[in-house]
Amino acid sequence: MMSTMSIKEGLLVILLSLFLFDTTALIHRREIPHMESKGQMQRGQVLLGGWQERSPEDNEILELLPSVLTKVNQQSNDEYHLMPIKLLNVSSQVVAGVKYKMEVQVARSECKKSASEQVNLKTCKKLEGHPDQVMTLEVWEKPWEDFLQVNILETKVLSSV
């Protein structure tokens, strides 16, 4: 016969769960909203698993950018490789790995695509006469699996000045 949990045991389980939740947040140095806030977060609080703004100068992200552009160029039907000009905005979310939302200013380079050769975008020069673009990308990285997925969410052509 199955035994039922007493009220005291149930309360103990709830209290233990809340303690573990607060401890996990503390370990990860993240602030959590209190139960009484009824879903409203205060300035400076971070939602666990939520999106966080990142600096476009963050070395971790700058090191990832060439691989991201390689994936973008694989998806593009353009005859020329796109090259990064400037990383405009970045936010990240911890999931099974890390998801990034990036806004990257890119330009068409003088380097033509060829199935047989690997291109180093750092050596490519900007192809003049073509406007830059701002691409909004969603990037999912799981480095322990050597996994990188890039989705192009939006592309805007910048008007030439």
UniProtKB/Swiss-Prot annotation:
Glycans are attached at N89. A motif (Important for interaction with host LGMN) lies at residues 76-78. Changing N77K: Abolishes inhibition of human LGMN/AEP without affecting the catalytic activity of cathepsins CTSL, CTSS and CTSB. GO terms for cellular component: cytoplasm; extracellular space; vesicle. Changing N77D: Reduces inhibition of human LGMN/AEP without affecting the catalytic activity of cathepsins CTSL, CTSS and CTSB. Disulfide bonds join C111-C124. SMART domains: CY. Belongs to the cystatin family. This is Cystatin cpi-2. It comes from Brugia malayi (Filarial nematode worm).
